[in-house]
Amino acid sequence: MSFGFPTFSQNRFTEQYSGLCPIAPGRGAGLQPCRRDCPVARWLVADHPVFGSDCRCRMMVGVNRVRIGRHELTGA
């Protein structure tokens, strides 16, 4: 299913921080993983290098645009 968002290969920012995503673990050294299972691979979770640890989840919608808050589909 496609949600119309950039894939990891299309989004350099997402690739850089893909270790934060539960689907692509292991590359975000020092960042805490999210405990939720998100069905959308574009979610980055836990500490964000810009916004800090108060931001629990965010969805990448562009190279430098970060949407912060609840998941539009699951409400998580």
Swiss-Prot record:
Q: What induces it?
A: Expression of this gene marginally increases (1.5-fold) in macrophages from 12 to 24 hours post-infection, and does not decrease up to 60 h.
Transmembrane annotation, as ranges: none
Chief location: secreted
**What cellular component terms from Gene Ontology apply here?**
extracellular region; host cell cytoplasm; host cell nucleus
**GO molecular function per UniProt:** chromatin binding; histone binding; histone H3 acetyltransferase activity
Q: What class of enzyme is it?
A: transferase
How does its activity get regulated?
Is completely inhibited by anacardic acid, an inhibitor of HAT activity.
Task: State its Enzyme Commission number(s).
Answer: 2.3.1.48
Annotated keywords:
Acyltransferase, Host cytoplasm, Host nucleus, Secreted, Transferase
Q: Where in the cell is it found?
A: Secreted; Host cytoplasm; Host nucleus
Q: Which domain of life is it from?
A: Bacteria
A single GO BP term for this record reads:
symbiont-mediated perturbation of host cellular process
Question: Per its database record, what is this protein's job?
Answer: Histone acetyltransferase, which by binding to the host chromatin, may manipulate the expression of host genes involved in anti-inflammatory responses to evade clearance and to survive in the intracellular milieu. Acetylates histone H3 at the 'Lys-9' and 'Lys-14' positions.
Subunit info here reads: Physically interacts with histone H3 in infected macrophages.
Query: What other comment is given for this protein?
Result: On the 2D-gel the determined pI of this protein is: 9.47.
What is the protein's given name?
Answer: Histone acetyltransferase
